[in-house]
């Protein structure tokens, strides 16, 4: 759900539209496989948290943003996945945030290894680094020896 901080700093049910102009977006918690489970938005009027993978996908995808995939598809009502990274876009020399760009990979549940993420990660990471990213605490051994 979406929750707003009230004047007593308590979280109450609310809507993203009440935060005003969004000044920052912070990933607070990630779940299994790296999907975002909790976001914090700070705005000119209020601060809110968005909880739950599907709520995050719906809120960010329904914001009027154009969602483009690597194949050029742009027909999504929600983000295809909560496996995302959010970066601010700055305008001008005074470093004012003009927008946020969302980078993502994969579709659906976010459990296991995302093929789209691995494709991009393989440009700069070894297979060992990629496996250890998706499967925490694993040890890679040669079992044939």
Predicted ranges, named:
Residues 1-145:
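Conserved, single-site charged/polar hotspot
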């Amino acid at each position: 759900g979406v929750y707003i901080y009230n004047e007593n700093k308590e979280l109450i049910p609310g809507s993203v539209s009440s935060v005003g102009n969004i000044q920052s977006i912070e990933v607070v918690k990630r779940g299994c496989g790296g999907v975002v489970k909790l976001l914090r938005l700070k705005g000119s009027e209020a601060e809110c948290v968005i909880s739950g993978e599907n709520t995050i996908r719906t809120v960010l995808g329904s914001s009027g943003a154009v969602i483009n995939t690597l194949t050029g598809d742009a027909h999504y009502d929600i983000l295809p996945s909560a496996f995302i990274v959010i970066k601010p876009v700055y305008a001008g020399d005074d470093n004012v945030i003009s927008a946020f760009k969302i980078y993502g990979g994969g579709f659906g549940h976010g459990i296991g290894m995302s093929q789209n993420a691995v494709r991009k990660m393989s440009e700069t990471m070894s297979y060992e680094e990629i496996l250890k990213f998706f499967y925490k605490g694993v040890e890679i051994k040669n079992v044939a020896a």
